[in-house]
Design a protein with these regions (language model features):
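Alpha-helical transmembrane segments and immediately membrane-proximal extracytoplasmic
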Residues: 1-431, 436-438, 450-456, 460-461, ...
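Amphipathic alpha-helical regulatory segments at dimerization interfaces
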Residues: 443-450
């Protein structure tokens, strides 16, 4: 079996395992625990998220042995790390924390633990079959596993593959893993839907007839979504700082009380627990006939505050769906202002907000098409998402992204010339170009090319400390 075929087989195995793991998490946490929480009496339901973040801290502290609540960021950190694998020791504690946070109503998404489970399983498969994976492919199954996690939880295989490949960089992609990611996403999706069926996450009926005003509206929607995503990203980063630097009992108590107050206030205003859970209930509420502009804007703020408090308390979950929900609610507010009922603005608002927040415009557009089942929204979503990217700039909800892939030649050229030294000949040619020890490899390489000399002599005062040759420079790439 050739190397590419081995990789694809392992990607398919990874996808099946991830599909099973995500299905188990969804059943236990999403279908049992969260539904039980939402059926509690109003007072107990308001307190549930506070209990959830407290249990999350216990899980991370004692089961995870001091692990952090990071989930999707663990995938990014592993991808950019030296060995390209997720450490498996904290996995039980992180999953306990995610289950407690999400199952008891924390305002975060199920894709966080799904991505983490996928990346961890991909790392496990790679370690289990080291003889089948060479150094060039050490991150491939990591990406494939993350793709499988997203594909399963959202029933969106294309989104899973694109997101996992796109999210490591703001202006680049993990393109080497694209085909294995597709295979793993397909295998995971097929496994997951065997248990939970084929229905879409946000089904929408009909397609709007697009006119010039809708396309102009998409420009405005992208601007608003970009500004909103910048504000939301700032809130997320501030919440993560609080979670990282505040004493656990203080943050859990303060944020838990805040979550209880938000939940109680939301119930009084909306007669529904719209601040709890990932936000699917909030999306459904925006499609009711009783919506008003003021209540929609208030809900936009309520969901943002609930998510921020959950993160600040140290809860474990995802940001993907909260971004989508914020964009959907913002788009609904615009739809009310322009007196439309096509759901065009909620859909493209969700795409633009999500794409800007995570710096994944392609994945956001694909997700909207898959989750709603309406590819006719893609053109205005493209426009809105493009504008949102421009407004977002270099901001992101995660600090674990890199802007772009580091060029190995640029990295090599930035190294000190001492790293490329070879022993000098005896004698050194008097015609050899001269460098000093404070030069970089790039400067020495340029001098070699321009002079066509066999080597550059590195001189410290009156002493030749070594030479730089083409071979000694290329040896740095090994």
């Amino acid at each position: 079996m050739t190397r590419p075929h081995r990789i694809l087989v392992l990607a398919a195995v990874t996808g099946v395992l991830v599909g099973l793991a995500v299905a188990a998490f969804e059943q236990v946490v999403g279908r049992w625990l969260l539904e039980w929480t939402l059926d509690l009496p109003a007072g107990l339901r308001a307190l549930a998220p506070a209990v959830g973040v407290a249990l999350a801290w216990v899980g991370l502290r004692y089961v995870g042995r001091g692990a952090t609540p990071a989930l999707a960021d663990e995938y990014l950190d592993a991808y950019h790390g030296r060995d390209g694998a997720v450490p498996l020791e904290p996995l039980p504690g992180k999953i306990v924390a995610a289950g407690a946070t999400l199952g008891l109503g924390g305002a975060m998404g199920f894709e966080g633990p799904s991505i983490y489970l996928g990346a961890a399983i991909g790392s496990f498969v790679r370690r289990r079959f080291p003889q089948l994976i060479d150094g060039r492919d050490q991150r491939v199954l990591l990406v494939a596993g993350a793709a499988a996690g997203v594909a399963a939880i959202f029933k969106a295989p294309a989104t899973g593959a694109v997101f996992a490949v796109e999210v490591p960089y703001q202006e680049d992609s993990a393109s080497r893993a694209a085909v294995p990611a597709i295979v793993a996403a397909a295998a995971s999706y097929l496994t997951f839907v065997l248990f939970f069926g084929l229905h879409r996450l946000f089904p929408i009926q009909g397609n709007p007839d697009l006119e010039a005003r809708e396309l102009l509206g998409a420009l405005a929607m992208g601007l608003l979504a970009g500004l909103g995503a910048r504000a939301f990203a700032a809130m997320v980063r501030a919440s993560k700082r609080i979670a990282g630097y505040t004493e656990p009992w203080k943050r859990v108590t303060a944020c838990g009380l805040g979550l209880a107050a938000v939940a109680a206030g939301t119930w009084l205003v909306y007669d529904r627990p719209l601040s709890l859970g990932p936000g699917y209930g909030a999306v459904q509420w925006t499609q009711t006939a009783s919506r008003s502009f003021g209540l929609i804007v208030l809900l936009l703020l309520v969901r943002a505050v609930a998510t921020s408090l959950t993160i600040a308390a140290g809860g474990a979950g995802g940001i993907f769906i909260p971004l989508f929900v914020e964009g959907w609610i913002l788009g609904t507010a615009v739809e009310v202002v322009v007196n439309s009922n096509t759901l065009l603005f909620p859909v493209i608002g969700a795409a633009a907000f999500l794409g800007a927040g995570y710096r994944t415009p392609i994945a956001a557009i694909v997700f909207v098409a898959e989750a709603t089942g309406r590819p006719g929204y893609i053109v205005p979503a493209l426009i809105a998402t493009g504008v949102g990217q421009l407004v977002m700039g270099r901001q992101s909800v995660t600090a674990s992204q890199l802007v772009r892939r580091e060029d190995p030649v640029e990295l090599r050229d930035a190294r000190p010339v001492a790293d490329a030294l070879a022993p000098p000949p005896d004698p050194v040619s008097p015609d050899a170009p001269v460098a000093t020890p404070d030069w970089t490899v790039g400067q020495a390489r340029s001098t070699l090319v321009e002079s066509a000399a066999p080597y550059v002599a590195v001189v410290d005062g009156d002493r030749v400390v070594g030479i730089v040759t083409a071979a000694s420079i290329l040896a740095l790439d090994d």
